[in-house]
Amino acid sequence: MPALACVDTSFVPPAYAFSDTAGDVFIPASSPTSAAVVVDRWSPSLSSSLYRIDGWGAPYFIANSSGNISVRPHGSETLPHQDIDLLKIVKKVTGPKSSGGLGLQLPLIVRFPDVLKNRLECLQSAFDYAIKSQGYDSHYQGVYPVKCNQDRFVVEDIVKFGSSFRFGLEAGSKPEILLAMSCLCKGSPDAFLVCNGFKDAEYISLALLGRKLALNTVIVLEQEEELDLVIELSQKMNVRPVIGLRAKLRTKHSGHFGSTSGEKGKFGLTTTQIVRVVRKLRQSGMLDCLQLLHFHIGSQIPSTSLLSDGVAEAAQLYCELVRLGAHMKVIDIGGGLGIDYDGSKSGESDLSVAYSLEEYAEAVVASVRVVCDRSSVKHPVICSESGRAIVSHHSVLIFEAVSADKPMVHQATPGDIQFLLEGNEEARANYEDLYAAVMRGDHESCLLYVDQLKQRCVEGFKEGVLSIEQLASVDGLCEWVLKAIGASDPVHTYNINLSVFTSIPDLWGIDQLFPIVPIHKLDQRPGARGILSDLTCDSDGKINKFIGGESSLPLHELDKNGSGGRYFLGMFLGGAYEEALGGVHNLFGGPSVVRVSQSDGPHSFAVTRAVPGQSSADVLRAMQHEPELMFQTLKHRAEEMMHTKGGSEGENEEEEEDDEFNNVAASLDRSFHNMPYLATEQASPSNSLSAAISNLGFYYCDEDVYDYISA
């Protein structure tokens, strides 16, 4: 059988050729050196296009001239010197304390309260403009649904930033209503506290207590039976309630997030139930308490046409309630204001929306105005529960790719493959078929014969006929053939120091996609494509779907000797729901969290609060284990083992045993105290376990005096 040096060059990629060897086997030649490869010039603007940063990131994220991602904390109003470089934040936060850093470990959530403030102001401005331009005779007064992100400082910031325009909160459970009541004590007295969700007597009593505390609570009826409790408890507590009701509209959102809409939605009252509620309130002398109509088409409403249909239907229902004698004042359009996760500005999927904030507000105001004018009904206050649109942009998850597995082609020698010609006849026949297909340039047959040869050789390996080295040679040969015909999988697997289940649960649970981008090296051309594999022992702990319909992500090669530094990736637009939904699969706890404000320092930012991620002791305690007792048990076992070694005599041996025991105890102590994630750099010396457990472990300073940790 002749060698395959004469294969048609149109069949073989330029980087490969078949060597003319002395035997009746063919093997791949080495690829040309990298010196022969022409590297195109690259720039941050090309990376911005590649990763669609100008689409999903506008106006808060850009690729700066240094090749790093910068945050524009005030959106389009951000001045050039106010941009905040994400890589500088990472270096500040993860740097050792001895060098002025905070010594925190990745993964890391970075919160930008300035972005949060800007999102609130933009939402309010959009409605204010639509109301003024259309001559609408009322105002907009939104609420933030705390379920999106219940973090104390996020909720407190929203109340503070929105106080001047009476921005309120929405709660859907008893803990959430307690949280909201406490926070709104520092907000506007006119701000709404919208009480949604399933309710029992205790929940309703809390809402009524809120009115006694001069909070503007509104009890929204999700189920007809709740009305009896509201009437009974309000009379017992001598509180005149403000009541709303949630309607099941006929308008339905067809996407994934539309399952809560339509007549079969989880929450809300049908038209029949609404009529019964009105009658019962009239009979109880409480029809004047019914003041708010609430509905929810679904999250991520894709287009203003669907939005307008739903709002118009609800506005007609609002007018009917006015006609029936209810003292209606507010129409609560619920959530649904979407964001552009993939930068496409399209209404064709759940990942994007075909409108801007301004267009959304214009559609809502116009729909309510037209219907109310037609029925000669006074324009109501417009309320929305736009959580995703408010908090998604303000938070960035940063994590590290610690290693990469890339497909390797085994460089076989003639001797490696000679066994195919000397051994099993079926294996030889499979090899000869593959040889002939390669000579013909028959790609389809190559795929078939590669599969047959591999299967035959695997059977031989299972029977003990082939060695592991021989099986590896066959695998290498087959992979090379696939690569030569363009059928191999060139995708690398990047191992990331993260748990998908803890930090990006929606990706695993509902296939929600988020923009994932390197936060640096954007001035360099990506040299590979990769998928991301997390730390968990779970096959679902991977990211192999990306925005733009891609099954892999352009990434930079990791430097093997470490001279290129660490490689950081950012997951963006995840400020809503991800933290609230995250679990502790494999006992990987929550990431470190820092709060970063724009400042006039040399690097434009200051860390105003820093919280280390959950330690191993923290997550063990969350699962009802007792870290202190576990530590003492292991320490006692170590002490026993040291004393039962035997054969040690003299002071020196005893000192060595004591030193060994102390080292073991210290190692155990550190393991409980440190985060469960990989320690990719030398960890800072830990405090004792007992001190770590009793201490909340956060750094904090008032924003007015944060210079001591300004960058």
Curated annotation (Swiss-Prot):
This is Arginine decarboxylase 2. Signal peptide: none annotated. Its EC number is 4.1.1.19. Belongs to the Orn/Lys/Arg decarboxylase class-II family. SpeA subfamily. It is found in: Plastid, Chloroplast; Cytoplasm, Cytosol. It catalyses: L-arginine + H(+) = agmatine + CO2. Disruption phenotype: Increased levels of lateral root branching. It comes from Arabidopsis thaliana (Mouse-ear cress). One of its GO terms (cellular component) is cytosol. Induction: Induced by wounding, methyl jasmonate and abscisic acid (ABA). Induced by salt stress. Induced by osmotic stress. Induced by freezing. Induced by the bacterial pathogen Pseudomonas viridiflava. Its cofactor is pyridoxal 5'-phosphate; Mg(2+). Substrate binds at residues 331-341. Keywords: Chloroplast, Cytoplasm, Decarboxylase, Lyase, Magnesium, Plastid, Putrescine biosynthesis, Pyridoxal phosphate, Spermidine biosynthesis, Stress response. Homodimer and heterodimer with ADC1.
